[in-house]
Amino acid sequence: MPELDASQFPFAVPAAAIAREAGALLKSYYERGVTAEFKGDVDIVTEADRASEKLIGERLRAVFPQHGVFGEEGTRQQLDSEYRWYIDPLDGTTNFAHGFPYFCVSMGLEHRPAGTPVDADGVIVAGVIYEPLRDELFIAEKGKGAYLNGRQIHVAPTAMLQESLIATGFPSRKRHESPNIHFYQEFTLRSHGVRRAGAAAVDLAYVACGRLEGFWEFNLNPWDTAAGSLLVTEAGGEITRFDGSPFLLDSHEVLATNGKIGKEMRTLFADMFAGRNVSPIPTPEEFKKRRDEAAAKEQ
């Protein structure tokens, strides 16, 4: 596996080592099983979440003592610092607890220069996502590209939604005010397929490396999206809110695409939010015509 130079990636490389250590810890818990506690309708936490967050917090303090840490499981340290890490020590806890092998460690670094208003976002400058069961390490630093196990990655070139594999997630609160089932149905009918695997950070990483062309979800938190949002943009993709406005850490919604199907997805969102009848599902002949027209444009 090619190794990235720590002098060129001063934030991501040390964070990657921490993510690997946390991932090894999670893997050990996964192999022996854990007990889950409910903290909402379906949202759970395990001893593995807490142990991973504790380890990450301790390692970050040792390597970056001036940095703040904001963790899903309650860690709040030096939040007035110029640099702030958003960490999800175990994204995909429900999967983990059930033995479903789709989860990760996610760490995103926000830079907040002096004078940044309290209620304004800084800039995400580094992101690390590690899948321990697959031993896949995604990293990015702003302006330097995105990488999977040391090799640069790019979003998929697919130009049409009908040929795209996309993903989504469902809120961890059963009574969330914007249920996603209607959107899931419409996008399933208009894409090559929709996947719902249960770990937003992994889904964003998969958009970045071209395994998915798009991903959308409601009710997310900064620790879910900080790392993945940078991976997507550094891999050449696009990340916005559903209406096309800029994505912010506290947006609570995300639409990440390869940059080619985003407009088509946003148009569908606009129609569905407005209660308008969406266009009929194209016939096979219409699908072929669209495909031929797209191919002609690329020539």
Show which residues each predicted segment covers.
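Solvent-exposed alpha-helices and their adjacent loops that cap or buttress functional pockets
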Residues: 37, 77-79, 117-121, 139, ...
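An extended, acidic
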Residues: 154-299
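Small-residue (primarily alanine) positions within well-ordered alpha-helices
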Residues: 15, 19-22, 52, 127, ...
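Residue-level signal for inorganic ion chemistry
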Residues: 26, 49, 60, 93, ...
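Generic detector of well-ordered alpha-helical packing
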Residues: 50, 54, 73, 89-92, ...
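N-terminal subdomain of lithium-sensitive/metallo-dependent phosphomonoesterases centered on the IMPase/IPPase/PAP
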Residues: 1-90, 260-267, 274-299
